[in-house]
């Protein structure tokens, strides 16, 4: 049968590769080598073979990837994709999602010796590219690849002394990722999704989202000429839905929770074979998100803060932030790692609840918070998130909607940063952590603002309050000032 001939050919290819590079295997039957290679080969041996194959021949490395049904493009800096549950390592092709053995989430692994050599030969200080792609050695992409047209990354890191004084923090920095093209950190993941989709020869991308991932995908895909199908809960703010429609996405509002939205998107992606941008399913999304950490480190001259505060929903962002810092540490660019502050809404905090209990077993929760971007009662990336919190000796903080609104006001009035609710949650967590003694007042802290307030104007007005409304009459103006107890400063000379 044709299928049988094809399988024998694959076995022969694998067997010959193993026999060529590993002495002493000529006495072992080819079918046995195939089984060992595909199912139970030790991770260290796999990595050694991958490196040997790459260094010996790009063609041989491509053969190794084709054995797993993936791209023949050899990424010099990537050694494979490792399952976070069973430990299986597979080649990092552009369309990989979850572990083929157990269904676990995959994590992209790197050759840090290669990264060190590459950066030594091309220092970051010599690079003109100010986008996330300036860190290409740390990303699963070819150096010669054409990247998306939108300027993703390079967002400002502000020294926020006035806000720090209000929060009681000696050294506070605000990383404003709301300055990305579609106004959120999620642009970093979506730019990576578009890049990998193009690499895989795909023309349509889909995802489920509470809003920001959806708008970022729609915008980045539009710039690359790709079509998008976006599934969002019907509760999504109109501003975010408007972005989707303006970018030309096919938008499906789902009457249900984020879990319901995720499920129907997964079924549709499977049915029509679209490229899957869902962050918990696609391991490359975290690789895009981690660039926020690479930027923070470089903007601070690679001198690490004591803490980095991150708002948490699905878990992919905090996991990406941690991986970025770990990658820098493994590459020798930083000498210590910061502790993470994991911030969730008290009305929806399954990851923090599990972290506080010291367990990897989380329990679904209701989505009772106005911070829609982190309203995820059934997180899809809990393993990586919980490991990030644990490995970083992280601080766990849950904040109420009222505390988030206060942080929105404080960011605006003392730092000039307009944050959506989820974007302000990290700063709300910093404030609460100081007040409760979880972090020291003399600590250095970076708080990541993940999204811009223009995405959710209704809740911005709710937090800031309504403006005065008067008839065009000076007496009415004075009455309005008086009713609000305003003391009006005069600039007129005496």
Task: Walk through the language-model features, giving the residues of each.
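Basic polycationic patches enriched in arginine
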Residues: 5-10, 19-20, 66
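Cationic, low-complexity basic patches in intrinsically disordered or flexible, solvent-exposed regions
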Residues: 27
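Short, Lys/Arg-enriched N-terminal segments with co-localized hydrophobic residues
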Residues: 62-72
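PLP-dependent amino-acid enzyme catalytic core
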Residues: 72-494
């Amino acid at each position: 049968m044709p299928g049988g001939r094809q399988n024998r050919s694959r076995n022969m290819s694998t067997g010959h590769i193993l026999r060529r590079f590993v002495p002493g295997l000529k006495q072992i039957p080819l079918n046995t080598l195939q089984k060992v290679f595909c199912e139970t080969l030790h991770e260290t041996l796999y990595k050694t073979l991958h490196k040997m194959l790459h260094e010996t021949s790009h063609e041989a490395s491509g053969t190794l990837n084709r054995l797993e049904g993936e791209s023949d493009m050899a990424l010099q800096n990537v050694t494979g994709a490792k399952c976070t549950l069973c430990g299986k390592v597979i080649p990092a092709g552009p369309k990989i999602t979850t572990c083929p053995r157990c269904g676990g989430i995959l994590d992209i692994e790197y050759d840090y010796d290669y990264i060190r050599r590459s950066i030594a030969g091309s220092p970051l200080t010599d690079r003109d590219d100010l986008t996330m792609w300036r860190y290409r050695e740390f990303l699963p992409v070819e150096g010669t690849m054409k990247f998306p047209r939108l300027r993703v990354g390079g967002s400002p890191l502000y020294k926020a002394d006035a806000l720090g004084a209000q929060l009681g923090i000696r050294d506070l920095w605000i990383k404003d990722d709301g300055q990305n093209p579609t106004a959120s950190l999620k642009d970093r993941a979506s730019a990576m999704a578009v890049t990998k989709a193009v690499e895989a020869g795909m023309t349509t991308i889909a995802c489920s989202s509470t809003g920001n991932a959806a708008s970022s995908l729609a915008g980045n895909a539009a710039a690359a000429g790709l079509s998008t199908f976006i599934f969002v809960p019907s509760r999504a703010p109109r501003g975010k839905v408007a972005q989707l429609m303006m970018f030309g996405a096919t938008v499906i509002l789902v009457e249900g929770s984020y879990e319901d939205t995720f499920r129907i998107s997964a079924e549709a992606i499977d049915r029509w074979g679209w490229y899957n941008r869902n962050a918990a399913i696609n391991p490359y999304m975290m690789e895009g998100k981690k660039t926020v950490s690479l930027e923070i480190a470089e903007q601070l001259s690679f001198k690490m803060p004591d803490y980095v505060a991150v708002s948490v929903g699905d878990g992919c962002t905090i996991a990406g932030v941690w991986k970025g810092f770990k990658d820098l540490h493994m590459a020798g660019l930083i000498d210590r790692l910061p502790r993470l502050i994991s911030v969730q809404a008290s009305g929806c905090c399954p990851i923090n609840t599990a972290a506080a209990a010291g367990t990897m077993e989380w329990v679904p929760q209701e989505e009772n918070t106005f911070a829609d971007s982190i309203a995820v009662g059934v997180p899809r990336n809990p393993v990586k998130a919980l490991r990030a919190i644990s490995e970083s000796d992280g601080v766990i903080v849950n904040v109420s909607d009222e505390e988030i609104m206060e942080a929105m006001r404080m960011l605006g009035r003392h730092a000039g940063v307009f944050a959506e609710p989820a974007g302000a949650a990290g700063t709300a967590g910093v404030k609460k952590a100081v007040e409760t003694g979880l972090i020291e007042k003399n600590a250095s802290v970076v708080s990541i603002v993940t999204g811009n307030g223009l995405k959710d104007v209704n809740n911005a007005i709710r937090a800031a309050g309504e403006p005065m409304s008067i008839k065009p009459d000076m007496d009415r103006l004075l009455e309005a000032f008086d009713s609000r107890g305003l003391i009006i400063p005069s600039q007129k000379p005496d």
